[in-house]
Regions:
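Acidic, low-complexity/disordered tracts enriched in E/D and polar residues
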Residues: 1-46
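Short linker/helix segments within small regulatory modules
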Residues: 316-327
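Long, charge-rich, low-complexity alpha-helical segments
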Residues: 31-129, 143, 147, 184, ...
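C-terminal accessory region of radical SAM enzymes
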Residues: 209-228, 262-302, 308
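Concave beta-strand-loop units of leucine-rich repeat
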Residues: 105-107, 133-135, 159-162, 187-191
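A C-terminal junction/extension of Radical SAM enzymes
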Residues: 2-7, 181-260, 306-309
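Short Fe-S-cluster ligation motifs
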Residues: 326-360
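Local cysteine-cluster metal-coordination motifs and their immediate loop/turn environment
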Residues: 294-315, 330-337
């Protein structure tokens, strides 16, 4: 029995192969492990051959080091029954018309209209919201908004707000305590950067300050620090759909509906038009299924299913037969062919696009 043992990698480990590297994503522990691409054939053989045969097929030293790595990192186990560890089903489906939305807020005499907009989004199944508030956040404003909404699908709200010298940590913490579905408040334009975690908050709630201005042009940055692991479902969605725009609606301050706040095209107005008709329109959904496997350069990147695929700002260097921009996101400095990160803004090949978007 011993010589028929197999090394199996756990089903919640998602493996992605790039041009020269591969990664093993542990979705349960939110960890990423890198390996040379040369191990990909070995990994593909694991369920087909017992370890005794694999040791003969591959270099003894490398094979034993690989087995030790998998077991030490708790990424797999030895078993005589590999059939008991089926692969994760990578098909994705969700019933809601809209899953996530971004709403812009500006100073107003009345904030009730924002609540009415949120209700329309909730009616279409929206679960996740980002409030981009171009004003200092206040309890009275949120109360005015939320009193107009009966949430049936809400899971979380993240708030981006302008800094105010009149507001202290406690002002924001009071809001987080009162509304546990608000998972984070990010204060933009702060003189200092800080990440506040208070014991009185729920485990998944955060308050943080950043110096950066609250500007749509600051969106779409790709770096190691913002490659988030959101669980198996999110990665599976990213495999089959666009990781940024799938089932997303952006509503600007005037009620105009877009795929993303940074994009120019408007598809209608949430205050004047039927929201379902807009989001169910083929033209609105045309980018929803533009996956990373179709994006130039990204298709060869090991991080492609962890990355948010920005379509608002791209290198503008590659288009498909239908005219869709399939260029790499402008603000990514990673080269999957060398495995190295570099500053994107100084790349000579990106200067034309940088000038076009007015980011000089």
């Amino acid at each position: 029995m011993k010589n028929k043992e197999f090394l199996v990698i756990y089903s919640d480990i998602i493996i992605t192969t790039g041009a020269i590297k591969m990664i093993l994503v542990d979705t349960s522990r939110n960890k990423v492990f890198e390996l040379p691409k040369s191990f990909s054939n070995l990994i593909n053989d694991l369920k087909n051959y017992p370890v005794t045969e694999l040791r003969l097929k591959y270099d003894d030293k490398n094979f034993d080091s690989f087995v030790k790595f998998i077991l030490d990192q708790d990424l797999g186990m030895m078993t005589p029954y590999p059939e008991m560890f089926p692969n994760v089903d990578q098909s994705f489906s969700s019933p809601e018309y809209i899953n996530n939305s971004i709403l812009e807020f500006y100073p107003s005499e009345s904030y009730e209209k924002y609540g009415e907009r949120i209700q329309k989004l909730d009616d279409l199944g929206c679960k996740f919201y980002e409030f981009r508030m171009h004003l200092p956040i206040e309890m009275t404003i949120l109360e005015s908004i939320f009193k107009r909404v009966v949430f049936n699908n809400l899971k979380s709200i993240n708030i981006l707000s302008l800094n105010s010298s009149k507001l202290e940590d406690e002002n924001y913490l009071i809001i987080l305590r009162k509304f546990p579905f608000i998972k984070s408040i990010c204060v933009f334009g702060s003189p200092v950067e800080a990440n506040i975690k208070e014991e009185s908050l729920m485990e998944d709630q955060r308050l943080y300050y950043i110096k950066e201005a609250l500007d749509n042009k600051n969106c779409g940055k790709v770096s190691l620090s913002n490659l988030f692991i959101r669980g198996t479902d999110q990665i599976v969605e990213n495999i089959s759909h666009n990781s940024c725009l799938h089932k997303k609606v952006a509503v600007d301050n005037d009620g105009n509906i877009k795929n993303c706040p940074s994009m120019q095209r408007c598809y209608g107005n949430i205050d004047k038009n039927d929201l379902l008709e807009i989001v169910d329109n083929t033209s609105f959904k045309k980018l929803w299924n533009l996956t990373k496997d179709k994006i130039d350069i990204c298709k060869d990147c090991e991080f492609r299913y962890l990355c948010t695929d920005c379509r608002a700002y791209t290198d503008m260097s590659k288009f498909d037969e239908q005219g869709l921009d399939i260029s790499k996101p402008l603000k990514c400095g990673y080269n999957p062919y060398s495995g190295e990160w570099a500053e994107w803004s100084t790349n000579p090949l990106k200067q034309h696009a940088i000038k076009y978007y007015g980011m000089q």
